[in-house]
UniProtKB/Swiss-Prot annotation:
Top-level lineage group: Eukaryota
Species, as recorded: Alternaria alternata
Full protein name: Acyl-CoA synthetase ACTT5
Functional note: Acyl-CoA synthetase; part of the gene clusters that mediate the biosynthesis of the host-selective toxins (HSTs) ACT-toxins responsible for brown spot of tangerine disease by the tangerine pathotype which affects tangerines and mandarins. ACT-toxins consist of three moieties, 9,10-epoxy-8-hydroxy-9-methyl-decatrienoic acid (EDA), valine and a polyketide. ACT-toxin I is toxic to both citrus and pear; toxin II the 5''-deoxy derivative of ACT-toxin I, is highly toxic to pear and slightly toxic to citrus.
Other facts: Gene clusters encoding host-selective toxins (HSTs) are localized on conditionally dispensable chromosomes (CDCs), also called supernumerary chromosomes, where they are present in multiple copies. The CDCs are not essential for saprophytic growth but controls host-selective pathogenicity. Although conventional disruption could not be accomplished due to the high number of the copies identified in the genome, the high sequence identity among these copies is likely an advantage for RNA silencing, because it allows knockdown of all copies of this gene simultaneously.
Amino acid sequence: MLCKFQVFNPIAIELSPHIGNQLLECRGYCKSPALFLKKICPSLKAVAKHPLIILKVYHDADDESRTLSRRQGLSIVRKLVAGFRKAGLKKGDCFAVTSFSDIMYSMVFLGGVAAGRVFSGTNPAYRVAEMRHHIRTTEVKFFIVEPELLDVVIEGATREGIPKDCIFVFNVRGQKVPYGFRSWEWLLQHGEEDWERITDLETLKRTDVARLTTSGTTGLPKTACQSHYNATSFHTVIATKSQASITWEPRTISPLPMFHVATVPAVHASPFRTGHPIWIMRRFKLEPFLAGIEKHQVTNLAVIPPLVTAIINSPLSKKYSLKSVRTAVSGVAPLDAGSQREMRKLLAPGVTFTQLWGLTETTGAMTLFPYPEEDDTGSVGRLIPNTDVKLVDEDGKDITAFDVRGEICVRGPTVVRQYYRNSKANAETWDEDGYLHTGDILYCDSKTKLWYIVDRKKELIKVRGFQVAPPELEAALLQAKDDIADVAVIGLKSQPDSDAERPRAYVVRKPGSDITEAGVKRLIDDHLASYKQLTGGVVFLDEIPRSPTGKILKRVLREWAGTEEKENVTTRRALIPL
């Protein structure tokens, strides 16, 4: 009996382009999953003899002496498999990495997943409250932490009952390991072991690779369960199918934080899987980024809108050449067509620069432009293969016409199956037909059949590529029970023609309170990550505008904000519209 079968081999290192070609049609047919695995996944020892195993794949963009070939990575990952098991983590337990980007970060990801554990990356900007929430929602049992970030993790982990011996120091740059802690190198000292194997489709679909936090609109961040099936499907579509027409060897540079969904599995697994070199930046800085593109002759460039804005507005764009780039893409948030055109001027003639759209819940891109298709209209492209989509109106009724805006709902092999242990959110997000309701408003053009983002049903604020949920900020401000009676947070555009935003709080003081704007901002600064700061300011009101049912009328606040920005008004009495 024939069966469809799809494999995510988290170790991926051993698959040379030649061997990997057998996996490109991973939704093809086979008589037996076990035979399929045997065919495409030869033993690690056999693959280690392949000549392409010695090629350097991972490169430290800040220290050229640090590189990793497949052979080196293979050994490190097999050692980590043994180390994770020796450390006492059980199969299915979740481990977290708290670190800035590094070539060894991906090895830890691969080693942990290969050992049958589940990855979860935390934002290095987290404060203690955010770290504790992350630990609770992902059920992290084990940490690998860079020394500079240890204090927040120790306090958060201790308060959530994680013992000290489950925290390892990620001293990849020779940093000193604090007394009483073990270096992550301890995990490399227990020999080498092979990875966990999955030999049936249903287990593949229900076994997680990662638990990734995603901002919600009704509370704190939720945790999306990315499965092996999701990861394999995404790699097959993005790293192979969408680039099938590319005739050169891709060379990339990654400025993105490695906890982000855009790097899982695109940065952690796909480079070893394809064999294409990638340069990893520890932290983003504009000049080293541009210099790296020129020096390493980067061909495939992925950026986010704030980065595009920084590039086109900086004189550094004239100092460094981007002419090596042969295709570029922008994602995470919408990019206005004007900025897209300005960025294209910096590239060589004929180079494609397009946009994509996706979510944490879709393992990344859900729409894109397959190379060499071009666009200058601000579209986010076409749906990736094997994806079902529907549009619904505000009443949840299907929209069947082109050029009509509606909430886009998707299902397919890259869509995660659930939020981790959050039945309420699952019921609100997935319908009875299995469609994920994204909260994003799109339409499909009748002439070109291209998709366009026009609005967000969700009230997420996009700050430097990160998602900020207004309810999280509102909840933090309402902790000042003696000073704040009511609050609403919205996002203001950083520039008139930009989609980057700044959080602004509208605050109602309690009687007798004299809390100032600085005092309100301090409530956020002291407890939440820096990108969640109220850079859009604070406006004091007598009353927050609400509908008869109590819903905050954020549309009204945005209208006021538009007027205030023009008139430089800092206070306004709230009038509730009829």
